[in-house]
């Protein structure tokens, strides 16, 4: 699965992860970050990645923002650029007994921290931009500093969206996951 954090003045960031379901280990294996570019530009770079035709992209609720000129939502602009966006925006996994999850940042951070401390979160050592941002991620007076956190946000979205991950040969459409033996018409 992959996840995007939208930006313009601050970077648009995308993180790709693989999930070993048997061992419950998350591997961050690729990332992309660029500012001051339009969705079609980012889309072409996303689509250069191997698996872009079947790896779903998780996106936050700000993907519903409309372009002032065209009226097209940000998520739709990425779909128009052939990016494999999930048909719904990111939500944290629902708590026990709940039907919907929220957008709490702490939920994702605690999940990532738990994975890091237990050896179930690994990042390829070639992802210099990711590690640069990770080293700067911090709190001040108990609150997260929301600067240069775009790759971390995308990582959080992806890590908490493992339930939407898929394998090669499976796809998503607006009704949900399609298995490898289901034709996309």
Show where each model-derived region lies.
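Alpha-helical architecture
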Residues: 3, 131, 147-151
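Short beta-strand scaffold segments in enzyme catalytic cores
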Residues: 12-17, 156
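Stable alpha-helical structural segments in soluble proteins, enriched in small hydrophobic residues
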Residues: 150-165
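Mg2+-dependent endonuclease catalytic cores in nucleic-acid-processing enzymes, primarily RNase H-like
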Residues: 15, 22-146, 165-185
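Two-metal-ion RNase H-like nuclease active-site motif
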Residues: 1-8, 59-60
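Catalytic-loop motifs flanking and including active-site residues across diverse enzymes
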Residues: 10, 74, 150-154
